[in-house]
Amino acid sequence: FNEDGTLQDTHGDYLPAMRQLAAEQGVPLIDMAEKTKALYEALGPERSKSLFVIGERGEFVTHPDGVVDNTHFQDIGAIKIAGLVAEGIRELNLWPLTMFLR
């Protein structure tokens, strides 16, 4: 996060290239970078940590010495991200995927 509470962009040229390619190829794009950015910024630096595998010593059986993993999600984080994917499917009306959503 930046000092003003916005998420720091670490993707470089990847995101514009991804968006351009989707537009050129005429394929739908669920822009998860934008969706997750909005989620993380709404939660803020401290609350967004609850989505990831971040824990003190003894908190995770698989990481007895503690862990700071800003890439992989805890269950609650995975559920939130899956919800954003479902939201994108609905927004783009991606048939037949929409028929599998609740």
Q: What are the residue ranges of the model-derived segments?
A:
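Catalytic His-Asp segment of secreted/periplasmic serine-dependent ester chemistry enzymes
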Residues: 1-102
